Amino acid sequence: MSEKSIVQEARDIQLAMELITLGARLQMLESETQLSRGRLIKLYKELRGSPPPKGMLPFSTDWFMTWEQNVHASMFCNAWQFLLKTGLCNGVDAVIKAYRLYLEQCPQAEEGPLLALTRAWTLVRFVESGLLQLSSCNCCGGNFITHAHQPVGSFACSLCQPPSRAVKRRKLSQNPADIIPQLLDEQRVQAV
């Protein structure tokens, strides 16, 4: 039986603390560290003040295909792939750094970010296993998450071709700078 390294255990505890702070679920912690389930639960309770949430991890690729989630997932995935390609980091460190970049760019709603860390980690696993990929939009040239084997040149992102329900959410003008004044005008008319 091999003896555990104290240095490796300290690294795992530090990594687990960072992941818990970012909102990781227990299954992600178990997969990325060598700490026991009992120690992870104890650490989670100590940092969060409550036990980790129960339940299964998201396992469907469909969540990443809906228009708003696709934009957020694509932003994260582009940052993650950039970090890997430049050799700045790899593995879970690349996921953490890409997720921090995503959080910097996307202001959080009260209920938290649209793309949670565990879902971002699941996205990485889907991309690495070949279930999802980044495809180039044939309109704007941006790279967006699509199902694997998307034919080249056949994809238009949800920013270039928003679904009708996205347009109903807010009336878009030809000039994006006009959106806020339009909303203010509508509110004034309704008030009168």
From Swiss-Prot:
Post-translational modification (record): Can be UMPylated on Ser-31 by SelO/YdiU.
Pfam families per UniProt: FlhC
Activity regulation information from UniProt: UMPylation of FlhC by SelO/YdiU inhibits its DNA-binding activity, which inhibits the expression of class II and class III flagellar genes, and interrupts flagellar synthesis.
Gene Ontology terms for molecular function: DNA binding; zinc ion binding
Co-factor binding comment: Binds 1 zinc ion per subunit.
Alphabetized UniProt keyword annotations: Activator, Bacterial flagellum biogenesis, Cytoplasm, DNA-binding, Metal-binding, Nucleotide-binding, Phosphoprotein, Transcription, Transcription regulation, Zinc
Cofactors: Zn(2+)
Location(s), subcellular: Cytoplasm
Record flagged with keyword Nucleotidyltransferase: no
Protein origin, superkingdom: Bacteria
Binding locations of Zn(2+): 137, 140, 157, 160
PTM-bearing positions, type O-UMP-serine: 31
GO biological process: bacterial-type flagellum organization; DNA-templated transcription; positive regulation of bacterial-type flagellum assembly; positive regulation of DNA-templated transcription
One GO CC annotation: cytoplasm
Induction, as annotated: Expression is regulated by a large number of systems, including induction by quorum sensing via the two-component regulatory system QseB/QseC, induction by cAMP-CRP, repression by high osmolarity via OmpR and repression by H-NS.
KW Signal (keyword) present: no
NCBIfam families, sorted: PRK12722.1
Role: Functions in complex with FlhD as a master transcriptional regulator that regulates transcription of several flagellar and non-flagellar operons by binding to their promoter region. Activates expression of class 2 flagellar genes, including fliA, which is a flagellum-specific sigma factor that turns on the class 3 genes. Also regulates genes whose products function in a variety of physiological pathways.
Quaternary assembly: Heterohexamer composed of two FlhC and four FlhD subunits. Each FlhC binds a FlhD dimer, forming a heterotrimer, and a hexamer assembles by dimerization of two heterotrimers.
Family to which this protein belongs: Belongs to the FlhC family.
Protein name: Flagellar transcriptional regulator FlhC
